[in-house]
Amino acid sequence: MEENEIQYGKITAAGEAGHRGREQEMKENGVIQEYTGSLSRQIREEYHISEEYYHGEIKRGLRNSDGTGVMVGVTKVGSVQGYLLQDGQRIPIPGRLYYRGIELNDIVEAHRAEGTFGFEEVAYLLLMGYLPSQGELRHFNEIMNRARKLPEGFTEGMIMRRTSGNIMNELGRSILSLYSYDPDPDDLSVDNLLRQSVELIGYFPSIVANAYAVKRHHFGGESLHIHYPEEGLSTAENFLRMIRPDKSYTEEEAHLLDMMLMLHAEHGGGNNSTFVCRALSSSGTDTYSAIAGAVGSLKGPLHGGANAKVVSMHEDIRAHVSNWEDEDEVAAYLGKILDKQAFDGTGLIYGMGHAVYTLSDPR
């Protein structure tokens, strides 16, 4: 019997069994929502802090008053360069991104020229501090083949039960639950932290792919296909294979995804989600709690979740701009967004601008 047929029966049975319970919960939630909704205006007024109190050394959003980032630590892992400081003034320069002192563009171009996959090499570089030899990379790939296999029963017991429909939430709660599958989750020795890190790098694509399949089935009414990772394939190839019902993908797709994985593997250690992870880790908490917190941060629309906001914003603009060729009409609606009169009322145009990069983004 096909693996997807086995899983299909389980998820369908679970969905039918929990339907009536969810209806009752929705009714109870409605009563609570009605109560809290009646108090929301008072709460907004009570917690509002006037702009006049933001002065001195108060840092808003990890930003200095001149727009530069707040120094939160020192790292040898990644470096981001987007401007120079001269006499207290920012001088824009073309953006550059370095992994362990190596310019990322050089790594990407080398793999593109050779037609090879580079994410695994980049992961090794970021973890260990140096580029692996051929033998070291081959051994690391063998370990990754093992790490991609989720614990027995994890997909059925965790991912298929009570799916939320949001992949980032599914990833976060799945990471937390992996604590229960770890024989030594609270050991903070370097040996154990490295083991957990390698396993999580392997687990992530499988968790996301399976959560995506369950989401399409549960909320989209599509047939459920759960595919196991295949040994000998790269992370990019395996992910594409697992999210497609027929396991098909092209070489171009795989190399494009591999390049994206390399480009987003590290970004200087000062972004919101990495900062959250470092703050949690500094308390001595376990790896799974720290990484799950980082994923929660990454989900936010002012961080990684901006991707989803860009899509929503485009849909909103399409609905309100009758002629895409009319630059004045497009500009007028963008002005409404900036003036907080349209879209989500935040005054933000998502996907534009960066806190560090000025002239260009090397990614």
Per-range role (PLM):
Residues 2-363:
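Hydrophobic alpha-helical bundle cores within soluble ligand-binding/oligomerization subdomains
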